[in-house]
Amino acid sequence: MTKTVRTCGKLYLAGEYSVLTAGQGAILKNIPIYMTGKIHFSERYQLFSDMFDHTVDLTPDDEYSLIQDTVAVMNEFLQSRSISLRPFFLTITGKMEQDGKKFGLGSSGSVVVLTIRAITALYGLALSAEETFKLATYVLLKRGDNGSMGDVACIAYEDLIYYQSFDRKRIAEQINESPLESILAQDWGTVIRRIQPHHPFDFFVGWTKEPAISRDLINQVKSAISSSFLTQTQEEVLRLEKALLAGEKEIMKESLEKVSHLLVELSPAIYNEKLIALKRASQGLDCVAKSSGAGGGDCGIALSFSETDSQILVERWRGAGIDLLYKERWGMDE
């Protein structure tokens, strides 16, 4: 019997870059543009992803290493629960791109969470969002990934969340010393809170159709991070979380403007011409817009508190060559 699962995309509202430092927070939103996994038991292991042009088994393959490593960890997890292993055929589709251009919504975390969900569905296991997050993070840490894991949290929880990063180095060092179950049972020091916005408003995702900055540039931006940047960003991230929960429109706008300004000060590479246009489109409107993620391309986000201004914002984006990728109504209408 074939099981079908899926994982969403994600975007940062605030806290990108700062959240790379343990103890720093960020706010992320799940985006319902999906990758899909189909899985069934088979006579031998077979893995296929539409990102590649070939099918593999568990023989090491550079292109499939992320999926294969996830399968290996999940097999270890299943055996720790005294579950007999059986081979399967896993198919993954959904590139989160258009005309070969990536939206910037997915991540390695998307693939790992999808693979975990597929395997647990096949074996009839029900994992919590926290368990899924920890397993996916374990896979990535074991591979040497040094990301914040905020994307993994957002994808695992499938919600608007506040995420506070933990000491990944400490957990990574234990991977070679302690069994999987022991590490999963620990308190990692992660903070993940779901956010239910109170004030009704529109959330928009604008796609620049340009790639994000290169890994080398990202590393340059990281090297510029100061204690002042971290302190100020954390203050605004927490203000934004409270404002979203309380429906305080002006504070939402102020906080997003401030974190946007902090990113501009951090590196001019974050806001390219398209992202500058995306942000400027909110000027004079009851809206606020900023870049999302690494910057230099991909997507930006906007909040609009007026139906009329929402239409104007989207028209301005269109005029600047920015596509409206996604729109969602947040909050509780009175």
Regions found by a protein language model. Give the residues of each.
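Short glycine/threonine-rich catalytic loop with a Thr-x-Gly-x-Asp
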Residues: 105-107, 289-296
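Short, charged, amphipathic alpha-helices and their helix-cap/turn boundaries
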Residues: 130-132
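DPxDG-like acidic metal-binding loop motif
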Residues: 104-127, 159
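C-terminal nucleotide
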Residues: 2-14, 18-21, 28-84, 97-100, ...
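Hydrophobic alpha-helical hairpins/lids featuring a short glycine-rich hinge
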Residues: 90-94
